[in-house]
Amino acid sequence: MRTLWIMAVLLVGVEGNLWQFGKMMNYVMGQSVVYKYFYYGCYCGWGGIGQPRDATDRCCFVHDCCYGKVTGCDPKTDSYTYSKENGDVVCGGDDPCKKQICECDRVAATCFRDNKDTYDMKYWLYGAKNCQEESEPC
């Protein structure tokens, strides 16, 4: 029960339509991995400052930048449609804005999969106090 409560607290602080993005990540990576990317490095989780610490953290930086370019809908709350095809995701639906959110999430999930070998536990729960450098532009 305590683990469930901790996960609920962590889920509240993550940007995006968390449930969809989390399910997409788990599907693309082939296992339950969402918890590993909460508060990883300087960009995975809520917000982001400093320099990405590795390729995994850069996936989150690019995801944050992608969300920043979305206009006309809210990437933090709006739902979108997608289908699963052979370990990959195909974004669908008629709403171009929601499709853009889906593409941001799809690219990030694929980036995590492609860079899973760079994941380093020393960056999990890393903390913003370790990310004080100037942020690079998107």
Swiss-Prot record:
Its cofactor is Ca(2+). PROSITE patterns: PA2_ASP, PA2_HIS. It catalyses: a 1,2-diacyl-sn-glycero-3-phosphocholine + H2O = a 1-acyl-sn-glycero-3-phosphocholine + a fatty acid + H(+). It is found in: Secreted. It comes from the Eukaryota. One of its GO terms (biological process) is phospholipid metabolic process. InterPro entries: PLipase_A2 (IPR001211), PLipase_A2_Asp_AS (IPR033112), PLipase_A2_dom (IPR016090), PLipase_A2_dom_sf (IPR036444), PLipase_A2_His_AS (IPR033113). GO terms for cellular component: extracellular region. Ca(2+) binds at Y43, G45, G47, D64. Expressed by the venom gland. Binds 1 Ca(2+) ion. Belongs to the phospholipase A2 family. Group II subfamily. D49 sub-subfamily. This is Acidic phospholipase A2 BITP01A.
